[in-house]
C-alpha cells in the first residue's frame, strides 16, 4: 500500500504537477469573470476583496522551502523510478498471522506489476503466541485460503529472507540446516526459480 501511495502522490506532487497548483499561475481576471458569472454574492464579494486569494509563491508562502518537489532528492523523473528505488531495495518484515501480507504478492493491484519483498518475521517470540509450533502453519493459511501461491509463500518464508541476510553477509547461513539451499539461492540470479 505504501508503494502504491508513493506513486499516487508522485503523480500529483512531482515538480511538473505542482506547477498546476502554483498560486502565481492564478489568472485573477479569469477567476473574477467566472465568479461573476457563476458564483453567489458572497463568493463574488470575497473574490473582489481578495479574501483567501494569493498569487504569491516563494519562501514566505512555503515555510522557507525552495524545492517543493518532495521527490527531487531521489532524482525521480517518472513513476517507474519509484519501482526501481522501492521494490528492488526494500524488504518488509511481516507477521505470520497478518492477512494483508497477500497484498505484497498481488501484482495485479501493485503498480507496474510489482511484487513487494516481504520477510517472514516469525512471531515465535511474541507474548501472545500460545503455541510456537503453530506460527509457520498460520502463515501458510494464506496459501490454504488461496490468497497467495506456494511460490509466493516460498518467497515470503525462504527466498526473500535468504537474499536479505545472505546478500549482506554471504556467510550468514553457514552451519545452519538451510546452508546448502541458501548458498544455491544466493548463487542464482534474482528471479530465477529456487
Label each residue range with its predicted role.
Residues 1-46:
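Internal, charge-rich low-complexity segments
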Amino acid at each position: 500500500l505504501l508503494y502504491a501511495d508513493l506513486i499516487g502522490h508522485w503523480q500529483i506532487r512531482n515538480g511538473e504537477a505542482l506547477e498546476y497548483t502554483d498560486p502565481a499561475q492564478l489568472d485573477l481576471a479569469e477567476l473574477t469573470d467566472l465568479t461573476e458569472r457563476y458564483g453567489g454574492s458572497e463568493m463574488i464579494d470575497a473574490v473582489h476583496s481578495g479574501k483567501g486569494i494569493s498569487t504569491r509563491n516563494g519562501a514566505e508562502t512555503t515555510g522557507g522551502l525552495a524545492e517543493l518537489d518532495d521527490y527531487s532528492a531521489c532524482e525521480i523523473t517518472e513513476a517507474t523510478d519509484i519501482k526501481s528505488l522501492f521494490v528492488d531495495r526494500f524488504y518488509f518484515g511481516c507477521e505470520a498471522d497478518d492477512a494483508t501480507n497477500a497484498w505484497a504478492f498481488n501484482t495485479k493491484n501493485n503498480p507496474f506489476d510489482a511484487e513487494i519483498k516481504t520477510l517472514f518475521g516469525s512471531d515465535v517470540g511474541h507474548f501472545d503466541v500460545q503455541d510456537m509450533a503453530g506460527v509457520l502453519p498460520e502463515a501458510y493459511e494464506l496459501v490454504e485460503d488461496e490468497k497467495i501461491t506456494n511460490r509466493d509463500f516460498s518467497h515470503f518464508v525462504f527466498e526473500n529472507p535468504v537474499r536479505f541476510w545472505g546478500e549482506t553477509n554471504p556467510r550468514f547461513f553457514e552451519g545452519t540446516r538451510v546452508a546448502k539451499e541458501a548458498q544455491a539461492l544466493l548463487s542464482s540470479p534474482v528471479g530465477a526459480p529456487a
